[in-house]
Amino acid sequence: MKFWKRTALCLALCAALLTGCVPTADTASSAAPTDPLTGQEALWPGQRPVAVTIENETSSTTQWGLSSASLVLEALTEPQSATSLCLVYPAVDAVPQVGPVAAGQDLYWRLLVGQQVLPVQRGGGAFDQNYLDYYSLRAVDALEVGTNAFTCDTTWTSRPLWRTSGNALAGVLRSLNISSALSESRLTDAASSAAGESESEASPTLSVPPLLPQQTEGKLPDASAADAARVQVQFGADNATGFVYDAASGTYKMLHADGTPQLDANNSQQAGFDNLLILFSASSLRDDGLTLDYDLSMGGGVWLNGGHLWTLTWTQGSDSTFAFYDADGRPFNLLAGRSYLALVSSLTGQELTVTNSAGKALTAASAP
């Protein structure tokens, strides 16, 4: 644990010193717009991504939409509760049946604010609502629109498996005065400038900065470890998410805390990801004594892809939400693809364990 703390601190200092004098990793320009969630070719240019919070308790064995989400976020926002997942899709039209829809979390909206996401939730706490109000964001909330956009198999007034879909969401956007298209007024300064420079006789397609710095090809830093076969992110005593590397597909397959496959109820497929990002972040208990606030300025972490592991330092980026630095303090890009991102805090004793195919630990670190 001390080694990880020293390593993260050294890397963070190197990154901070180098940020001002070393250019960020350059991404090759392309005529085709890229998806801000995956770094791949955008199939829905000009559309707002959709972010849906879903239940992830141990008893949540029925989850819809996992296997087709471009990005999945996970963090413990209440020390005495289970984590929720945030499934992110590139557009309303890309949203399959998804659920069970859970309470909104301002942490997820903070992470995704640069991508102009459309939040979908089932109610939310005071911090969630305050964040939405402060930034004038309108969520599609099951407690507001009810059966106009959400369905369930039990009595609506109980705690059912509420779920929705892109078609259902599209049917209520007009009545909620929500646009599914990107808005120039909400673009970041960098994105607005880029859009202005590319203006021609035809109006340019609006775009937003990517969440992660990603590339389809290019040199990567040397991996810190190979044969990273199994991953366990422990959020609490009975609250964990695991992954096992599948060489045939080149992805990390998602596991429940008990080691069983985490399946998508839409197609019975196990959720799999090209990239795993486990980012360590300092956290503190908020004034309500119930919820955690995370420091999103910088920290350490690991990246896994293709059965390899890299240690990294992360900070806020200029061309993307996150910027990553290798063990030598040099900026680098992740490979394009679907990603799982977990924020791990030391406040509740959360930890990460990575083992090779022989079961030998490659890392066993508590969050700094």
Language model region names:
Residues 1-11:
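Bacterial N-terminal signal peptides that target proteins for export
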Residues 28-73, 79-368:
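A surface/extracellular/periplasmic glyco- and lipid-processing/surface-interacting theme
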